[in-house]
Amino acid sequence: MRTLIVSLILLCSQSLGAQPVMVAVAANMKEAFTEIAAAYKTNNQSDFRVVYGSSGNFTAQIMNGAPFKLFISADEHFPLELYRQGKTINEGTVYAIGKLTFISKKSFNASSLKNKADLAKLIGNANKVAIAKPDLAPYGKAAIEYLKAEGLWELAKDKLIYGDNIGVATMYVVSGAADVGFTALSLASSADVAKETSYTVLDSKQYQPIAQRMVLMKRAPKEAIELYQFMQSPQAKGILQKYGYITP
């Protein structure tokens, strides 16, 4: 009987240990993080499950008990809010600075933009302008800041269609549901998106810096901590820079 109990305990322990570590990653990071995760796994056997989405939605889910152990956000606001609510080990760290990019269908040729007048013309000719929801996605918020700073908000506001995250907003342009839009450089420059679209990196002085922070949840396991540390390694930083991010 005692042997049976011990066997059951060991079986339960193994089952619990087999559960993958849940990692929440902002949608703008999908291409870069896919490569980072592959690099990490070459020397580590950690099993983790990655979910991509909007930083705002992840924050709400974590507040409501979602079992994420590492949150790689598209901004600082949402991770710091989780810290203030006592959900994280500490304030975490900024791992990258993102770049806002204007993207279009090939026929609109966003790469030819030289000035505000060119941008106004493209927006004026567009039927729909795609952005991420500004209350959920930092790149959507930055897009609105940019439009207002450039005096183009009135021209664009009635044409806006909103994606739940920056990945969805980008796909609106790729699919032709929108003629133009705003996205992250990391997505605009990815092979699958670039072959269908054209883009220009926008003046970063016209929106608040997109500082991207990551945080570990309280009681984060060793696997999450090791991945968090790898995100700050020279190898991971090199990948981030490849996708257009500025790294600390």
Where do the PLM segments sit?
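Absolute protein N-terminus
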Residues: 1-3, 17-20
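Sec-dependent N-terminal signal peptides
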Residues: 3-14
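Exported/periplasmic ABC-transporter solute-binding proteins
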Residues: 19-45, 49-51, 56, 60-66, ...
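Short active-site segment of divalent metal-dependent hydrolases/proteases
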Residues: 72
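Short, P/G- and charge-enriched loop/turn segments at secondary-structure junctions
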Residues: 88-91
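Active-site-adjacent helical/loop segments in soluble small-molecule enzymes
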Residues: 99
